[in-house]
Amino acid sequence: KLFDIDVVFNALHGGYGENGQLQKYFEKYNIKYTGSGPKASELAMDKHKTKLIAKSNGIPVLDWEIINKGKKINLKDLSFPLIIKPNDGGSTIGLYFADNKDQFEHYILSAFNESDTLIIEKYFKGREISVPIVDGQVLPIIEIKSSNFLYDYESKYQSDKTKYEVPAKINSKL
């Protein structure tokens, strides 16, 4: 036995702590840990793969485009407003709202500082809903109400103005 560890409480945020790599390491060495397994973690942190799985299961998703660093982008084909975000990662780090081509060109460079692969999708104004599931049990649904235009990093971690409605008021037909 390489380690004398009862269990790892995985509270790492981002990167290897969330993308399945650390979880693979734990499993390789038979180390018990909290949180999702390697595959679930990998899929949760890869927006492109997650969208493909959702779409293949009949779940509506916004159309998206994958943009890799160094790839030429045809700006005349873009329809605004757009959301630009890293394909990997979370916490809305590197999330940008572009309302025109000038903003897009500026924000795409900033987003590439966070990741070499980006997701571009049409902006959709909707409600921010979270459905927590633990061990297959659905917990009360949460509506997140940000005082900012977008539910961004600041809204999530730095603002005391973000409100959480539990349970969310959702039409029972849904």
Feature locations, PLM:
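Short glycine-/acidic-enriched loop or helix-start segments at secondary-structure transitions
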Residues: 19-21, 93-94, 130
